[in-house]
């Protein structure tokens, strides 16, 4: 299953990059990449957050998220700033997916933001892997494809 998940993630990564560039996002910019992690409880999530930090990622504070059916998960992001290159993102996805599998935590995809080539930040220009039609409406969880 892990191999097919990673293959799917590689394909989704290329789709996101293509969509961003087609929409005019700056190909030369450094992008904030947010890898979404979730677990059933805080203690489990904290373990993966500590390990991600040791790997060089910035880790956001844990938040509780209610998903379909009323189930509650603890979530955080492992964040890096890199060029928008599929190979770099693929390597991070594989690294974090392997970590989450070892610690029995969910890897919920990755996201990034539109980078204006003119240097102007536009609020709400986020690409979400769940929303293949463009910008996401979510405040903190951009660009995730499952």
Swiss-Prot record:
Keywords of the record: Cytoplasm
Keyword Cytoplasm: yes
Region spans: Disordered: 110-146
A GO molecular function held by the record: endoribonuclease inhibitor activity
Localization in the cell: Cytoplasm
Gene Ontology CC: cytoplasm
InterPro entries: RraB, RraB-like_sf, RraB_dom
Keyword Aminoacyl-tRNA synthetase: no
Top-level taxon of the source organism: Bacteria
Biased composition, class Acidic residues, residue ranges: 115-134
Biased composition (Basic and acidic residues): 135-146
Assembly and interaction partners: Interacts with the C-terminal region of Rne.
Function: Globally modulates RNA abundance by binding to RNase E (Rne) and regulating its endonucleolytic activity. Can modulate Rne action in a substrate-dependent manner by altering the composition of the degradosome.
Stated family: Belongs to the RraB family.
HAMAP family: RraB
Descriptive protein name: Regulator of ribonuclease activity B
